[in-house]
Structures are given as structure tokens and as C-alpha cells.
Amino acid sequence: MNFGKKIFDFATEIFHINRSITGEGVRQTLTAISKHIPKLEIKSVSSNTKVFDWVVPKEWKVNEAYIITPKGDKICDFNENNLHLMGYSIPFKGSLNLNELKNNLYTQEDQPTAIPYITSYYKERWGFCISKNQYDKLENGMYKVVVDTKLFDGVLNYGELKIKGKRKKEIFLSTYICHPSMANNELSGPTVLTFLAKWLELCEDLEFSYRIIFIPETIGSITYLSLNLEEMKENIIAGFNVSCVGDERAYSYLPSRNGNTISDQVALHVLKWIDNNFKKYSWLDRGSDERQYCAPGIDLPISTICRIKYGIYPEYHTSLDNLGDVVTAEGLNGGYWAIRRAIEAIEKNKKFKVQVLCEPQMSKRGLYPTLSKKDTYDKVKLMMDFISVCDGKNSLLNIADLLNIPIWELYELANKLESYNIISTRE
């Protein structure tokens, strides 16, 4: 089934919201997500709350921001493109000459048509982001600058969804909701995860429980960990950071710090069979919330599956990261299925033990074909090869690797053999 168009339409719906690490844009985004997953809980943590080595920052609100040129033209209008205003800009109103103004203008020199994405969360300043082409056309004279913003003691918001399975042990899925109008680096993660959550809520026989969060990057994951660490360390057995999953350029894998968790094994297996040319990165290439989840002392078994990795593609952190050119419906569908395949693999990754000594007699159970066809040999060989490694020690993922076959091509076979009591599940 292709979910790409539905995910793309949802991304289009929330693209223009001004998201940051705090503020109304985060709440608007979470509210939009909750329309798809009504059980999502929107939570808040007060500014100035100590979270490990950090402090929850003040909340940021933008009313308007723009520049009036000497000729009276309005440029860098926040209402036209929210990337024009540097994130967390402090208030400013005044008139500046061109040289003074340039101290507060930011461009992307190598991409003259792009508006760069710039933030200053932890040092108070104001600024505007402008394309190099527009910057080069600025004329001498006096410019009127309006930055109508407010920093105040408020809250940091995040969304949390818990889905109960047969076991208390959890699979953890995390994405961020703190960037303004950018498609792959921002919206691909939360929109894909929204639809994965919708699917999981409809599953009636989940083996594991699920902890799914939508957070501001870095400060959000630090805050969430500070509030939930003991429970997370006790229960989480696998998980994925969901980021940059909307383009068609590549598939990518970023390992956990140790690189040997079930999340790593599953990610490598799934990507091998989806795209054998996938890009494999090292822990040293980390850059998103896996930095916190896999930090020493936290040590959660979290890896990352991307399409093209954040920081790698040229449109990253600019206005060129858009819906249509970078993020497509087909790209989002590919990202969705890569992570869904990984989740399903963890759910199905049981150990099986054959229940008879020597090879079982398949014909008396009606499992051996009586008519020889072109593909008969391959089907029988796969079945017998599968049984031959069901020793109670090999997991289904191990078996798939031994047989050099995608794990999802073994689900039906395992169920059938178990239903005939030829194999049984081992914990």
C-alpha cells in the first residue's frame, strides 16, 4: 500500500507553520498531528526547569518582522517566509544605514537564491536571513527594521503517545518538530511518524509496547530523558530516530553508539533488501537526537534510518528544502516503509525450534507439493532450509541472514510451520 500522497498532503497542510524549540508553532503542529492520532498527549515543561546540564529556555513569540528599504519596499517579511527571521530573534525597532543593517543579515554565499535557516537560541541577538541575490541588490540609505518578538517565561511543549502491547518492553520512536518551513529536515520526520503511529494503533496483536514522541530537537530530547530516563532504560529494547525520510535520493543508516543493538541489526538488514546501495555512516557522523539517546550513561539502543542524511544534501537548512523538489510523495512512502519494515522485523524476531527429530515428513501434513512446477524446488528448499536452522537459538532475523532472504519473506512460512506444530516459539 502506498501512503505517500496522504503523508505529502499532511506535510503541505502544516508546512507554513512557524516552528521553533518553543512557542505557538510547536503547539499548532502537535494539534495538527493529534487530529490523526487523537490519543497523543500534548505536554508542557516550564521555562527555567533544570534538565540535566541544561535549562528549558524562555518561550519565543513572533508577531511580525520585516525591513523597509529606502524606496519604501518591504523585504525579509516574516509573514511571507518564516525563514527570513533568525530563530529566537530578540525585539528590535529602529532605523539603520546599510552598513549597520548588514551586521544583522545572513546569506548562503554558495546558493544565491536560497534563504538560509539561522538560529540563536542561547545568545540574545536579532537578525534576518536573505538570499544572496537580494542582498546584492540592497542600496545605500536608511532602512526601517521591525522585529516584533517576545521572549518570556512560558513552556516547552512535546507530544507523547503510548501504545500498549503484550509486553511491557518498548520500541521507542522519536522525531523533532522545531524547524520552520523546510520539508525534508523538518516535516518528513513528524509526518511519516504520524502515519506509522496510526498504523500501530490499528494493530491488534502487538508484541511490544510503543513510546512515540514528537519533540523539539536537542533540548526536547534532553528534557524528555530527564523526566523519563529510569523508565526508558528499564523498558526500551529498540528504537529509531526518524529524520530526513522524504526524498528519493538515497537510503541511509546511522548506528547507535555501540553499533550492535537489535535496532542496528534490523536497520542494516532492511536497508540491504530495500536498496543495497544504501549509505552507511558512523557514529561520528551523528547530528540529531541520537546524540542524546546514545550518550554515555543514557545508552539506549537507538539507531537512525534516513533517506538522504541530514547535513549531506545541498538544500539542507535553506528555503530550497521544499515540498516537490526535495520531498516527494514517493520519497515519503519509501521512508515510511523502511521504518515500518524495521518495526515489523523487531515484532516478528522470535526464536523457533523444530519439534521433531531429523527432518519432519512434510507430505503427510500436505506441505510437500505433489505437482512439480518451475518454482517447486525453490519453495521446498526454502522451507527445508528454514526448518534446518530452527534450533531454538537463531532468531528469525538471524535465519533470514543465513538464508540470504528478506525477513518479511519468512513471516508467512514461519506462521504456517508453527500452525502445523513443526516449529514452536522460544523466548
Predicted regions span which residues?
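N-terminal hydrophobic/helix-forming segments and targeting peptides
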Residues: M1-E427
